């Protein structure tokens, strides 16, 4: 009986120390390790309990059932394995946090990137139809946050028709659709029209996850062709060996 108690106590303290270590690294509570033995050295963590973070405690996410974690982890890892360790180091991404019902200021969101903390939080229950593409959309925000000089929004905006204007912020707009347009006219999705940075992220996510659509549409849409070339050219400035 004493031995059993000692084992239980040791497991408790190990879990506590592990949780404290993770918190000290990325400042998110209630996380545990899901997988750290990965080919590109990404560390996958999951929410053991709900957590609230942010300067105004305005970011919330909830824990998931194991079967959901296991299912979505396979999808997420397969997509993030497209990035090698060297590229991830350059863009400053190391930790992937898995949870569900992720929101910021009460608005549900697919992911929250934090370039400074090398972290990307992913809502594993977000729209299953677009889930894989959204992963790369959020990765682009990490890239963009670290290389603003390459992804200049004024230069990007000039690629559009002269009469087009983005909104002030992504949440200021009702343009939230992620379905791919049948007629593009410079944009892959409705959400692309919200802000310049979201447009870039949408273009990047299509380049990585849907090469056939990109090739087909850029042959017919000169604006989209320029946007795709802009993204590719500047990604290669970060890593000349990057494979699209």
Question: Across the structure, where does each feature detected by a protein language model lie?
Answer:
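Hydrophobic, Leu/Ile/Phe/Ala-enriched alpha-helical segments that form helix-helix packing faces
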Residues: 12, 76-87, 143, 208, ...
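Non-catalytic architectural context of zinc metalloproteases
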Residues: 20-70, 98-101, 168-181, 197-199, ...
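Auxiliary, metal-adjacent structural segments of Zn-dependent hydrolase domains
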Residues: 53-115
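Active-site-flanking segments in enzyme catalytic domains
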Residues: 92-244
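Classical Sec-dependent N-terminal signal peptides that target proteins to the secretory pathway
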Residues: 1-20
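An N-terminal domain-start capping segment
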Residues: 20-23, 80-83, 153
